[in-house]
Amino acid sequence: MKTQLEGDRVLAGKEAVAELYKTGYFGRPREDGLELSLVEAAYLQFRGKIEIELEGRKLDFRALFEQASLRQPNFELKYIVYKDLKERGYYVQPSAADFRVYPRGSHPGKSAAKIFVHVLSERQPLPVKLLQDSVISAENVHKQFILAVVDEESDLTFYEIKTASPQGEMPEPYPEVKTDATFLEDRVIAWDAEASGALYAGGFYGKMLDPERLQLSLVESLYLFSRGIIVVRDRKDRIFSFDEFVEKASEIESSFLRKYGAYKALRDSGHVVKTGFKFGTHFRVYRKVESIEKIPHSEYLVNVIPSDYEFRLPVMSGAVRLANSVRKRMLFAVEKEEGVEYLDISRVKM
């Protein structure tokens, strides 16, 4: 079947509607025939279904690929993903998100598409704002959002990305105690044995320095300080104000306030939040800890990122792979003017 390359589309005659669209749902019917996207046309040419001409000259697969790459950004990446999905048995159509994918056993006209697929090279940065907008747009129309990443060897990795609203099950975010604590170099120590035990056993705050004293992280300390649970003094016994604590903590760790915002949101929603250093993340998060003698596995790993953050996909891939390998969900907490928003990213098989 002869077709014509025009701009970023390939045009076929009316006979293509019956042969290509009604049997395989390729392209979009028009009054005068069928309009194919460049990836659809390249796939059909690869399968020997069509011939493509440009200004009277027949294009072989190489010539078409070169022309398409000039006419459409990321063409080769999109072709790799499109061909992979087709060979997995999916009906795939181009869309604003790159592709919409229909459930197995279904097709256009039988049911709605289930998945939006966005395609990127492993080398391309991904602004978190763009990612959030894309995910929310998909969820607003009840679609699953999949990010297809093509590495330098043209292997594919698929990630499901969705918004999240994690809810913990701790009955109270902190026990009803009040005690003094001292800000040392980069952590805080509570000295009272009874209060230390209550904070550790009742809310899994900090780590016991010994049977009587509790050492607290900076974010834990500010959270308890803000609720009147601890009074924080410096090493000369001067009491800190809230702003003074924030200033000193921010000198120690430049991202302190951002981390604290996520810590506060997670604690306020009923979680137990501990450092995620051993996993290379900011936090590991538990839905509920009933006993410090029998601590369960954490549910999430959380990285806190600013609203103007750009994902580097190899870094994102490493974080997600580690989280999935230890049976945890990887959440990215995006800083907002008030609170945080979460993106849940996991590796999936198509």
Curated annotation (Swiss-Prot):
The active site is at 286, 297, 328. Its EC number is 4.6.1.16. It is an enzyme of class 4 (lyase). GO terms for cellular component: cytoplasm. Belongs to the tRNA-intron endonuclease family. Archaeal long subfamily. NCBIfam families: endA (TIGR00324), PRK09300.1-3 (NF006795). This is tRNA-splicing endonuclease. The gene is endA.
